[in-house]
Amino acid sequence: LYTSGTTGRSKGAMMSHKNLLSNAQTLCELWQITGSDTLIHALPIFHTHGLFVAMNTSLLAGAKVRLMEKFNVDAVLEALPKATMMMGVPTFYTRLLSETAFNKAVTANMRVFISGSAPLLAETHIAFEHRTGHRILERYGMTETNMITSNPYEGNRVAGTVGYPLPNTEVKITSPETGETLPATEIGVIEIRGDNVFQGYWKMPE
């Protein structure tokens, strides 16, 4: 899957079957995705969120997917009463909050709303819970590793945070100058180890 990354031209991230399967299995267990679920899917499938996170977990669990061409607030509002899960970017949730029809009644059948691909403002998290009674589950990942961290499905989901490392995934923050592991309060380079980590960039071994 191609990713723009942070510098230069797009790079092809080489993902193995093991990378994809291990992450999907972990997420299905962590988020308790089963064949009884119905996912509202309005994300692009040329991106890791829509393709690897949303589709792979649903296919592995045997869940139903309500696949939409693009995000349309009216279509989502219509689908919510018969769905149990939604994965989206923060703007999906702010747009839903702008609709008076979005309330506890329309989300009564939902069990989890998941957010990623961009930071979710704490204000949005709080407003969403106030309106619906649901606390959005925010997680963090990248094309090269799939998902790395997640707020808990059961337990306290802290607004403005992306939770803890996934099971079987090791994460540490290191100094870009020395490579030494930094204290929790310091900013540094994220280093990840696990079956979810990709094989490298296509034809770019450097």
Predicted regions and their residues:
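Short Gly/Pro-enriched turn/cap motifs at secondary-structure boundaries
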Residues: G160-L166, T181
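Conserved ANL (AMP-binding/adenylate-forming) active-site segment centered on the GW(Y/F)…HTG consensus within
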Residues: G133, N196-E206
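Conserved AMP-binding/adenylation subdomain of ANL enzymes
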Residues: L21-T38, F46-M85, E99, E170
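Conserved S/T- and glycine-rich ATP-binding loop of Class I adenylate-forming
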Residues: T3-T6, L39, I45, M86, ...
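Gly/Ser/Thr-rich phosphate-binding loop
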Residues: A83-G88, L97-R157, E170
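Conserved AMP-binding A3 loop
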Residues: L1-S22
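Short beta-strand->loop structural element characteristic of the AMP-binding/adenylate-forming
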Residues: K11-M14, H41-A42, A63-K70, L137
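Conserved beta-loop-beta connector loops within the AMP-binding
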Residues: K172-R193
